[in-house]
């Protein structure tokens, strides 16, 4: 289990993370999403023990990660720009990791090198961006760390490689690996993650199991005999509100039965609850925060 407790982090007097609290269950895949500059990469560096929290703590199975080799040996972090020795081949990087990770599985390594069609004698510096990421995935899956942290996991991967990677991650979860993935590709995250957190201005505005989140965020289309204004619905927790004449499309947080009971007081001639996906949830949350590009 990972516990992020009241974490604060600032750079040059600017708060990047502000009293952040999140718990991530063991053996799960947690999707970390948010706009640019929200603090996602900063949080991943703190989780990896590279940086220290200004306040609060980050615990892995009850142990603080910062300057704790016993914890950090169970964590592998793949950044948005993975590091390799400049002239190294993937086989040379494999030999390097073998010295630090005794559990490194050569059979697994060869399987993914073959699956990803990675040239083993070609310097990694000559790989494409997508191939470099695939190479790091092959090494990571062979190491099989207890905790895997991924920044922009799907960036540079073609659809076939994305599918192969998602299948590999699901197999590792069956062995109780815990994965945190930061990505702008929300549709990919929705396919693979158990739970999510939306990070905005250093705070987690929404977090939890995807199905629980969907149970409390609803897209509703209504039609009325007469025009109504947004103020009529002030008793609801409205994330998004769009009106076109007598037709209203809104996104509302809360218990759906209570919401429908309240809306029926206005005698709609149509009331329909529509399915909502993760990308829409993110957009509606950002719209409420004033990101007008989503209008």
Describe the predicted segments one by one:
Residues 165-254:
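ABC transporter nucleotide-binding domain
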Residues 251-295:
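C-terminal coupling/interaction segments
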């Amino acid at each position: 289990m990972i516990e992020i407790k009241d974490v604060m982090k600032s750079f040059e007097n600017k708060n990047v993370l502000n009293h952040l609290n999140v718990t991530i269950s063991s053996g799960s895949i947690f999707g970390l999403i948010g706009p640019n500059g929200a603090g996602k990469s900063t949080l991943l560096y703190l989780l990896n023990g590279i940086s220290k929290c200004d306040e609060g703590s980050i615990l892995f199975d009850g142990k603080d990660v910062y300057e704790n080799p016993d914890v950090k040996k169970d964590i592998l972090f793949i950044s948005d720009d993975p590091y390799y020795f400049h002239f190294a081949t993937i086989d040379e990087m494999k030999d390097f990791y073998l010295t630090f990770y005794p559990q490194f599985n050569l059979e697994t390594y060869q399987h993914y090198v073959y699956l990803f069609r990675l040239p083993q004698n070609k310097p990694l510096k000559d790989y494409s961006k997508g191939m470099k990421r695939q190479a790091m995935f092959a090494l990571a899956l062979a190491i099989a760390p207890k905790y895997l942290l991924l920044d922009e996991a799907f960036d540079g991967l073609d659809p076939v490689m994305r599918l192969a990677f998602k299948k590999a991650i699901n197999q590792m979860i069956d062995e109780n690996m815990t994965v945190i993935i930061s990505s702008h590709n929300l549709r990919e995250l929705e396919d693979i993650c158990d739970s999510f957190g939306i990070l905005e201005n250093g705070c987690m505005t929404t977090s939890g199991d995807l199905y629980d989140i969907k149970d409390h965020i609803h897209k509703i289309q209504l039609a009325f005999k007469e025009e109504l204004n947004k103020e009529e619905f002030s008793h609801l927790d409205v994330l998004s509100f769009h009106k076109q004449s007598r037709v209203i499309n809104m996104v509302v947080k809360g218990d759906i039965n209570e919401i429908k009971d309240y809306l029926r007081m206005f005698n709609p001639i149509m009331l329909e609850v529509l399915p909502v996906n993760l990308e829409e949830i993110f957009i509606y949350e950002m719209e409420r925060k004033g990101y007008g590009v989503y209008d």
